């Protein structure tokens, strides 16, 4: 699986992200590093992954609901297929937990 052209830079980024989250500065760091459009794209990818893992809608329906392209949905679907199943189970648990919290559960 392709992760980055420069693993050293990628690992430095991950270390910086870990420190930001540990110190409660994730919002500021991501605002510094990502444009508003990039932040929106990441948030959209989370919604795509959530919908794909939920398996209650066809990809075309997800595309229409999220107002995005078929290619964007396909990229999300393809990444899900190559990730370890245990990791995807964890992601699904996290997304389900977040959705319950948003709906007033937990």
Swiss-Prot record:
Q: Which Pfam families match?
A: Trp_repressor
**Which Gene3D superfamilies does the annotation name?**
TrpR-like (1.10.1270.10)
Which parts of this chain does the entry mark as a DNA-binding region?
59-82
Report the domain of life of the source organism: Bacteria
User: Which parts form a coiled-coil structure per UniProt?
Assistant: none
Q: Where in the cell is it found?
A: Cytoplasm
Sorted alphabetically, the Gene Ontology cellular component annotations on this record are: cytoplasm
Q: This chain belongs to which protein, by name?
A: Trp operon repressor homolog
Please tell me the species this chain comes from.
Histophilus somni (strain 2336) (Haemophilus somnus)
Q: What taxonomic lineage is listed for the species of origin?
A: Bacteria, Pseudomonadati, Pseudomonadota, Gammaproteobacteria, Pasteurellales
Query: Gene symbol?
Result: trpR
